[in-house]
Amino acid sequence: MPDGDQARAQEPLRVSILRHGGHLVASVHTALDDSQLLRFRHELVDQIGRYRARGVVVDVAALDVIDSFACHTLRNLAQLARLRGAQTVVVGVQPDVAMTMARLGTSLHPVPTALDLEEGLGLLDLPDRRGRA
């Protein structure tokens, strides 16, 4: 691994993962590169098992770009969470980000989305968790 990549791998992720009842809330505070996205996915899936979380909210409100790799990683994260017994909701997609994603044909589908944390937590507590996806 080149020195720059190794240094980035050692950097703390700018993501906070907090417990909220039986759920985890992961707030992404700044853009993550591909290797950081993969570390985030690994760490979150690990915490789902550690805390026996039944639901996960991923808050992306701070992001001004969600590229195709980030979409793929979030979809994969939701699939891994589902295999571990937890549902996932992505919240906080900004209007400009949503318009760009639609223009480029990228999507978070089938991952449910919600406007904000409150709505996302509400979706996790519903028996039918389809969301806006």
Residue ranges of each PLM-predicted region?
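Non-catalytic signal-transmission and effector/linker regions of two-component phosphorelay proteins
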Residues: 1-19, 129-133
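STAS-typified acidic loop motif
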Residues: 13-41
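Hydrophobic "anchor" residues on beta-strands that sit immediately upstream
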Residues: 23, 55-57, 112
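Expand to "…catalyze enediolate/carbanion chemistry for C-C bond making/breaking, isomerization
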Residues: 40-44, 118
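Amphipathic alpha-helical interaction surfaces in cytosolic regulatory modules
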Residues: 51-54, 58-107
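Short acidic-hydrophobic, aromatic-tinged amphipathic segments that line or gate anion-handling sites
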Residues: 110-120
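A cross-taxonomic marker for long C-terminal extensions/tails that follow the last structured domain
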Residues: 118-133
